[in-house]
């Protein structure tokens, strides 16, 4: 299956206007984490927080709604969110942890959960995955933003990917775009051997593709994920639509997912023939 196993798919957005102002697309991840903290379902969450270095991101343990909101928005540079899970346990003494990550990070988390030692003294209460085609190093991002878009890293407000382009928004209202074909040389090499676009091992996966502007596409994959979404809807913090009732719908998600699988499976075969490391 191009999306992996899932129970249902929906289009959704947060009902909180402050979240929608700050968050990317429908603001689902921020809304889910804030709801979890306020309802005591979660003690803390691992997030990719903003830094002072323009588009760069760094992993952080967020324990308040304010910290979650400050970390809102898509990040296209690598943020090793899994690395702060030890901090969540040892430094913050958290027991109910929410985790969000890219497909490769979700795979690592699932392996950690199944490892005999597991998350010692900690319950990975919910694992959320982000749709991801590829990611960039900070140096690669800097080249895209400054050399192609002509905007200083310190002046970047946010970045986004859509309609075949990489978009850069400055703090001063400038909006520049870069053709995606010009960004490929700056992609992380490890992204070229990943065949997972929709975070297939998460409890809940989300991304903008498939939904209208301002909404998020969500794959509910597990009973744990289904229960979490239902609680959010009942609490009035999330509004949803049937994915079949929106455009462009799952056809576009399927197209991109299959593109990633087919392209990167060929790369894996080529690397194996050359004796280079491959994931399987």
From Swiss-Prot:
InterPro entries: Co_F420_Hydgase/DH_bsu_N, FRHB/FDHB/HCAR-like, FrhB_archaea, FrhB_FdhB_C
UniProt entry keywords in alphabetical sequence: Iron, Iron-sulfur, Metal-binding, Oxidoreductase
Cofactor(s) listed: Ni(2+); iron-sulfur cluster; FAD
EC number from the UniProt entry: 1.12.98.1
Uppermost EC category: oxidoreductase
Reactions it catalyzes: oxidized coenzyme F420-(gamma-L-Glu)(n) + H2 + H(+) = reduced coenzyme F420-(gamma-L-Glu)(n)
Protein task: Reduces the physiological low-potential two-electron acceptor coenzyme F420, and the artificial one-electron acceptor methylviologen.
Family listed: Belongs to the FrhB family.
Oligomer status and interactors: Complex of alpha, beta and gamma subunits.
Name of this chain's protein: Coenzyme F420 hydrogenase subunit beta
Species per Swiss-Prot/TrEMBL record: Methanococcus voltae
Lineage: Archaea, Methanobacteriati, Methanobacteriota, Methanomada group, Methanococci
